[in-house]
Design a protein with these regions (language model features):
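N-terminal secretory signal peptides and thylakoid transit peptides that target proteins
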Residues: 2-21
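Residue-level recognition of alpha-helix initiation/capping sites
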Residues: 5, 55, 101, 166-167
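N-terminal beta1-alpha1-beta2 submodule of the flavodoxin-like/Rossmannoid cofactor-binding fold
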Residues: 16-119, 125-141, 197, 201-218
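Short beta-strands and strand-loop turn motifs
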Residues: 43-44, 119, 153-157, 187-188
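Short beta-strand elements in bilobed, periplasmic/extracellular small-molecule ligand-binding domains
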Residues: 70-73, 182-189
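A short, structured active-site edge motif that brings together acidic residues
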Residues: 75-79, 150, 189
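Short, glycine-/small-residue-rich phosphate/pyrophosphate-handling segment
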Residues: 146-185
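A short acidic, helix-capping loop that chelates divalent metal ions and anchors anionic groups
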Residues: 192-196
Length: 218
């Protein structure tokens, strides 16, 4: 059970309810969030509109909007996104991708975003295939995306072992580092197998609080 905001902690410590509550309640809002009109782009990877990761996403967005953030949401599982074939026609952003699909709707919002939120169910210890399709297509706008901005990870998993989330978190953190972004929070929801199970955990509240905290206006 985890929220990781701005500070480094031991992963096992992060996977406890106490650490999650401590981080959510005691960390101050970051200074960069003081400006108004923060542009937030949320990309989800769940194929279940009423699933656990969607619940976390909804709560994060609710918190973000309450403090004035401008939120754009892209539900990848319900969009037409073709897998990157590595043809290199785009040349890392020098030309358009050969696939004319719904990524052309998403790309301007990714490029303009102050904060990018990735939301996923945990599928075999990684991103869902639907979200990974989108991430792979970052290649076509790599040069535009490779610039300072903020990032958040929201994830939900059925199981609650201490080794449940490290692989996903490492993948996300590596992506963020490569892109030159700053990780400002992770909600890693364990024991979130069904929506009703998730509703009985602290993770929806933590997602809401994180949305408010990282998107707060002065």
């Amino acid at each position: 059970m985890t929220v990781h905001t701005l500070h480094r902690f031991d992963r096992r410590t992060l996977l406890t309810a106490g650490a999650a509550s401590l981080l959510a309640s005691h960390l101050p809002a970051p200074a960069w969030a003081a400006s108004s009109g923060l542009k937030v782009t949320v990309v989800t990877g769940s194929p279940h509109r009423h699933g656990s990761s969607f619940l976390l996403t909804d709560e994060f967005i609710r918190g973000a909007k309450e403090v004035g953030a401008e939120v754009y949401r892209f539900d990848a599982a319900f969009k037409r996104v073709t897998a990157c074939s590595g043809c290199d026609h785009c040349g890392l952003g020098a030309a358009d991708c050969v696939y004319r699909d719904d990524m052309f709707e998403l790309n301007p919002h990714l490029i303009d975003a102050d904060l990018i939120v990735l939301s996923t169910p945990l599928y075999y210890f990684g991103f869902s295939a639907q979200l990974k399709l989108v991430i792979d297509r970052f290649y076509a706008i790599n040069s535009q995306l490779h610039s300072p901005r903020k990032a958040v990870l929201l994830a939900a998993a059925w199981n609650s072992n201490d080794w449940t989330f490290p692989a996903l978190a490492h993948h996300y953190e590596t992506l963020v580092r490569y892109m030159g972004w700053e990780d400002v929070g992770q909600i890693l929801g364990t024991s979130c197998g069904t929506r009703s199970q998730t509703e009985n955990t602290e993770f929806p509240r933590l997602a809401y609080e994180l949305g408010k905290k990282v998107c707060a206006r002065a």
